[in-house]
């Protein structure tokens, strides 16, 4: 699978919504980054959160390291609020 296709795949990219929101903000604001800072922070926090999950699963020997989309949904539902 190509890198671009993998980044658009919900199973491979847990932060697809945040990616799309950041891109949309940039498009709507003529690429003025300072107007989209909150979107960038949310994306960065999303990547940090799922990277931590991947590291934990790798340490525990759980395969695949990145949970599938359905499993990620269950993980987020088990938390009281969105961690990012």
Swiss-Prot record:
One GO biological process term: mitochondrial respiratory chain complex assembly
Annotated motif Cx9C motif 1, positions: 15-25
Residue ranges of every copy of the CHCH domain listed in the record: 12-54
The entry's keywords: Disulfide bond, Mitochondrion
Gene Ontology CC terms: mitochondrial intermembrane space; mitochondrion
Record carries keyword ATP-binding: no
Disulfide bonds: 15-46, 25-36
Location within or outside the cell: Mitochondrion intermembrane space
UniProt cross-references to PROSITE patterns, sorted A to Z: CHCH (PS51808)
Motif Cx9C motif 2: chain residues: 36-46
PANTHER family referenced in this protein's UniProt entry, alphabetically: COILED-COIL-HELIX-COILED-COIL-HELIX DOMAIN-CONTAINING PROTEIN 7
Family classification: Belongs to the CHCHD7 family.
Name this protein carries in UniProt: Coiled-coil-helix-coiled-coil-helix domain-containing protein 7
Protein species of origin: Xenopus laevis (African clawed frog)
Record gene name: chchd7
